[in-house]
A protein has these predicted regions:
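An active-site-proximal structural segment forming one wall of the substrate-binding cleft
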Residues: 80-91, 100-129, 144-161, 182-199, ...
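N-terminal substrate-binding region of glycoside hydrolase catalytic domains
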Residues: 2-113, 119, 126, 132-133, ...
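Aromatic-lined carbohydrate-recognition surfaces of secreted/lumenal glycan-active proteins
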Residues: 145-146, 150-186, 234-255, 280-294
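Aromatic-rich peripheral "rim/lid" segments of glycoside hydrolase catalytic domains that contact
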Residues: 3-45, 84, 117, 131, ...
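Extracytoplasmic/secreted cell-surface and envelope-processing proteins
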Residues: 66-70, 100-102, 134-138, 179-180, ...
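Alpha-helix N-cap and loop-to-helix initiation/capping positions
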Residues: 33, 37, 69-73, 102-106, ...
């Protein structure tokens, strides 16, 4: 790897691509079980997807409000994350908050420790995960999500600036058509100018045709979801159009009657729909979920989200995504 070409990570215009580097079992243990990651195989696949472009590697750390949090940052976890940042790749590092006690002081300390430990490897730092999802795996299950975001974004922005680090800071959500949703109402009531000034992006996780079968055209569905998110949800709460949208998670699992060819088509059509909306809606990033299956033999859809099988052999969608990165990425 030492002789590999390094791709500078900067703020040029265009879509920045990425992928969650594991399987569902590594990110959400209650949704799937499977084989452990093989870092060498992951890096091989990431090199192929990246080509000569910038590339993000999405991964997750969880804050629980216990002594384990300090251990998480001080353990040899750092090499486990840094080893995927060859050739100029950066982490899209998600800090989930699973603390039921709403200990903001400990949350701030956790964010500061993560930045001190991982800062140079981070391209995007996401504060909380799916805070408007009130069931597993969303952070909305635990309460205080809005305070965790408002405080966390400002603290992270300040600490990165103090260290002269250029990572972007933001939060994400899942689609919501309810104008009275408590999360967004609380965001609108509590956010201030300092928060908006510290906010580099708002992310969206969305999975058309997964939990709910899609009726109609995929590109139209992507367009509808993203347009509503920008022009209704974000506008309604006062987040300006100058704040970019990141597509943080988007994917389609294979399985019985869920064919590899359909997954490849999903990736192609979804990415091109996002590209078509990039200028109009100020979308700057697209990240696929996820790189490999948790367990290719398991027919449950949560086990087959990958564009690689669990033995790291490619499905057709892998080459489709690689070609899209080469064509549309920066």
């Amino acid at each position: 790897m030492s002789g590999a070409k390094i791709i500078p990570f900067n703020s040029r215009g265009g879509l920045r691509f990425g992928v969650y580097m594991g399987g569902v079992s590594e990110a959400h243990h209650e949704l799937a079980t499977g084989k452990p990651d093989i870092p060498e195989e992951i890096n091989r696949a990431l090199d192929l997807l990246q080509g000569d472009k910038q590339f993000l590697v999405r991964t997750y750390l969880g804050f629980t409000g216990t002594e384990q949090d300090a251990e998480l940052v001080d353990m040899p976890s750092m090499p486990d994350l840094a080893r995927y940042t060859w050739r100029g790749r950066k982490l899209d590092l998600v800090l989930s908050n699973w603390d039921r006690c709403c200990n903001l002081a400990a949350w701030v300390e956790f964010i500061e420790n993560v930045i001190a430990r991982y800062g140079p490897y981070i391209g995007c730092l996401q504060i909380c995960e799916e805070p408007n999802l009130y069931d597993y795996p969303g952070d909305g299950r635990f309460g205080c999500a809005v305070d965790n975001i408002l405080t966390g974004v400002k603290v992270a922005h300040q600490k990165l600036k103090q260290r002269a680090l250029s990572a972007s800071v933001g939060f994400n959500a899942v689609p919501c058509s309810d104008p009275n949703d408590g999360f967004w109402r609380e965001i609108a009531d509590k956010m201030d100018t300092a928060f908006i000034n510290a906010l580099d992006y708002v992310g969206l996780n969305f999975y058309p045709d997964v939990a709910v079968p899609l009726v109609g055209d995929l590109a139209k569905e992507v367009t509808s979801v993203l347009t509503e998110f920008r022009e209704e949800t974000l506008r309604h709460v006062g987040i300006p159009g100058s704040v970019p949208i990141h597509i943080c998670e988007n994917g389609w699992p294979t399985g019985p009657y869920r064919y590899y060819t359909r997954q490849a088509e999903f990736v192609e059509r979804s990415v091109r729909a996002v590209q078509d909306l990039r200028g109009k809606l100020n979308i700057t990033h697209y990240e696929l979920f996820c790189l490999r299956d948790a367990d290719t033999a398991n027919p449950d859809l949560n086990h087959q989200f990958g564009i690689l099988r669990d033995d790291y052999s490619p499905k057709p969608a892998f080459d489709v995504y690689r070609e899209l990165v080469a064509e549309l990425g920066v």
